């Protein structure tokens, strides 16, 4: 079945080190925490944070240097503290809803959460169990060991439920490991978080994949409930001429399989404007590409990628062509160049977002050795073979409790067309755990 032996190699790749706490570090943290107004309304928590972390309360504990208590407070809603503190789009979520931000800079919530997560690592703090009566004989299978599956597993195991994760790879973490480059998220942080989840009693079966060596009907017979959390890992395509040429890759597959070609002295074009596009561009640059170009059809202020990540990419030499669209990839057998067309942004009736429209006659070509599509993700076609209702876009259909058309099976995260962030995936996982526990209490 696999024992996760590969996990050691993957999770011990060199990455940025955590900042060790010293006097100066503590002073900066205290200054950041003192800036918080401890609002009673808590828009940062109730409106901004997908996980509804009790932000004012954990920051209050930091002010009083009660770091263990701050960690306990965060534990009530999340098990990904040091991770979300680093990679969440804080400016669009918690910090974007901070009252301080109305007339100035918001509280640096991300740094404070990361600080508490790091404190827990340095002081070997564990997740606390709160076992409920009559749950210890209940069994749940979770398909997928990414942020959503891991979060669901942790919140179930805390209550005493027997949880088994079925993971298609030989390591846990999902996109936390292969989808987010080491320079953004150190893998020792991911490993520590997963180790603590496994210490709750969660079991893992590696190299298990639905549709191949794992049968959902057999799992139904063995478990009380099943949670599908294996994500949407197939890169979307533009369906343009030349997209099947040698040298055209999907961004998700490239990051996941880490099977990059030799980029040295090559020109690489990335199509997209999200964090995957930025991550791929910065990764390719680090691997020696001569020129890295991102093509994005809208304006800079409309890029869904984090502002800081975009800025960092540009500082590293990544060129971004805003308001451009790829219309054709040219080459005989292999990519030689791409044809671009400039766009203008127009307000279409009924749309709240400006739409890009190609400017006729503005076509031009750009040399390219490789083209990487980073246009978002879609679910694998085999989802249709699970015997569950799906939407027209091939997402699994669920009700408000995340139950599928089979009430015994739940689904969440990108499988149901989620919002594409780690925090939202984790929120789905926590909600599913809570809903399953409520189901158990009925019988």
What residue ranges belong to the model's regions?
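A conserved short coil-to-beta-strand element within the FAD-binding core of flavoproteins
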Residues: 206-217, 323-334
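Rossmann-like dinucleotide-binding cores of NAD(P)H-dependent redox enzymes
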Residues: 162-165, 169-200, 204, 256, ...
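FAD-site-proximal beta/loop scaffold in flavoenzymes
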Residues: 244-265, 348, 352-419
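Residue-level detector of alpha-helix initiation sites
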Residues: 79, 146-148, 171, 274-276, ...
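Rossmann-like dinucleotide-binding core of oxidoreductases
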Residues: 235-244, 262-322, 427-435, 443
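Ferredoxin-type iron-sulfur electron-transfer modules and their immediate structural context
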Residues: 2-139, 226-244, 331-335, 345, ...
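Glycine-rich dinucleotide-binding loop and its adjacent helix/turn
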Residues: 116-134, 195-213, 235-287, 390-405
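N-terminal Rossmann-like FAD-binding beta1-loop-alpha1 element of flavoenzymes
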Residues: 139-162, 277-285
């Amino acid at each position: 079945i696999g024992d996760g032996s590969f996990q050691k190699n993957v999770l011990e790749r060199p990455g940025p080190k955590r900042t060790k706490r010293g006097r100066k570090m503590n002073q900066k943290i205290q200054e950041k925490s003192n800036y918080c107004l401890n609002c009673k309304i808590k828009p940062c928590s109730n409106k901004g944070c997908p996980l509804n972390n009790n932000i004012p309360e954990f920051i209050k504990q930091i002010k009083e240097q009660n770091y263990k208590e701050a960690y306990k407070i965060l534990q009530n809603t999340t098990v990904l503290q040091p991770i979300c503190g680093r990679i969440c789009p804080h400016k669009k979520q918690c910090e974007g809803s901070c009252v301080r931000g109305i007339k100035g800079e918001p509280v640096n919530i991300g740094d404070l959460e990361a600080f508490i997560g790091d404190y827990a690592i340095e002081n070997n703090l564990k997740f606390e169990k709160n076992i409920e009566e009559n749950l210890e004989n209940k069994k749940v299978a979770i398909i997928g060991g990414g942020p959503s599956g891991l979060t669901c597993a942790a919140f179930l195991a805390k209550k005493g439920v027997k949880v088994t994760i079925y993971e298609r790879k030989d390591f846990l973490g999902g996109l936390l490991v292969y989808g987010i480059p080491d320079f953004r998220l150190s893998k020792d942080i991911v490993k520590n978080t997963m180790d603590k989840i496994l210490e709750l009693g969660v079991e893992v079966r590696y190299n298990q994949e639905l549709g191949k060596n794992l049968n959902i009907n057999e799992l139904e017979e063995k478990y009380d409930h099943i949670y599908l959390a294996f994500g949407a890992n197939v890169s979307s395509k533009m369906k343009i001429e030349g997209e099947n040429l040698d040298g055209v890759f999907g961004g998700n597959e490239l990051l996941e399989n880490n099977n990059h070609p030799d980029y040295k002295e090559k020109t690489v074009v990335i199509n997209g404007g999200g964090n995957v596009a930025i991550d791929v561009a910065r990764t390719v640059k680090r691997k020696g590409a001569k020129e890295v170009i991102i093509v994005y059809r809208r304006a800079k202020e409309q890029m869904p990628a984090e502002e800081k990540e975009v800025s960092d990419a540009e500082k590293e030499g990544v060129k971004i062509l805003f308001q451009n669209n790829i219309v054709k990839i040219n080459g005989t057998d292999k990519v030689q160049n791409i044809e671009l067309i400039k766009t203008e942004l127009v307000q279409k009736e009924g749309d709240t977002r400006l739409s890009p429209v190609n400017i006729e006659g503005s076509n031009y070509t750009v040399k390219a050795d490789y083209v990487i599509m980073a246009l978002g993700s879609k679910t694998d076609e085999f989802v249709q073979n699970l015997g569950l209702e799906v939407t027209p876009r091939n997402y699994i259909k669920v009700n408000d409790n995340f139950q599928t058309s089979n009430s015994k099976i739940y689904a969440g995260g990108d499988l149901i067309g989620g919002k594409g962030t780690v925090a939202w995936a984790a929120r789905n996982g926590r909600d599913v755990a809570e809903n399953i526990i409520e189901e158990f209490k009925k019988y």
